Amino acid sequence: MLAWVIIASIITAGFSVALVGMNATKAQGNAAASAFESVARQPEAGDQINRMLLFALAFIETIMIFTLTVALILLFANPLLGKLS
């Protein structure tokens, strides 16, 4: 039973980081492309668009950091292992 929990934790950590990483990268690319297009249409609003883009990128990156934190907890400090041993 303990081996299955370890295997499931490794697979879950790998898939979660990979999937969230791909989606976060795509979301950041879409946000940047939209910001560049908006600045090209309205150059006078460039400072406000830049500020909003940085907030959006920070929120997107926060999701990735939370996922990485959960994956590292599953790999190195798994709370399920203490209950099974």
Curated annotation (Swiss-Prot):
Q: Which SUPFAM superfamilies match?
A: F1F0 ATP synthase subunit C (SSF81333)
Q: Which domain of life is it from?
A: Bacteria
Q: Where is this site: Reversibly protonated during proton transport?
A: 61
Q: Decide whether keyword Zinc-finger is in the record.
A: no
Q: Which membrane topology term applies here?
A: Multi-pass membrane protein
Q: Which GO terms describe its biological process?
A: proton motive force-driven ATP synthesis
Membrane found in the keyword field: yes
Q: Which GO terms describe its molecular function?
A: lipid binding; proton-transporting ATP synthase activity, rotational mechanism
Q: Which UniProt keywords apply?
A: ATP synthesis, Cell inner membrane, Cell membrane, CF(0), Hydrogen ion transport, Ion transport, Lipid-binding, Membrane, Transmembrane, Transmembrane helix, Transport
Question: Which coarse location class describes where this protein primarily resides?
Answer: membrane
Question: Tell me, what does this protein do in biology?
Answer: F(1)F(0) ATP synthase produces ATP from ADP in the presence of a proton or sodium gradient. F-type ATPases consist of two structural domains, F(1) containing the extramembraneous catalytic core and F(0) containing the membrane proton channel, linked together by a central stalk and a peripheral stalk. During catalysis, ATP synthesis in the catalytic domain of F(1) is coupled via a rotary mechanism of the central stalk subunits to proton translocation. Key component of the F(0) channel; it plays a direct role in translocation across the membrane. A homomeric c-ring of between 10-14 subunits forms the central stalk rotor element with the F(1) delta and epsilon subunits.
The UniProt subunit note reads as follows: F-type ATPases have 2 components, F(1) - the catalytic core - and F(0) - the membrane proton channel. F(1) has five subunits: alpha(3), beta(3), gamma(1), delta(1), epsilon(1). F(0) has three main subunits: a(1), b(2) and c(10-14). The alpha and beta chains form an alternating ring which encloses part of the gamma chain. F(1) is attached to F(0) by a central stalk formed by the gamma and epsilon chains, while a peripheral stalk is formed by the delta and b chains.
Task: State the protein's name.
Answer: ATP synthase subunit c
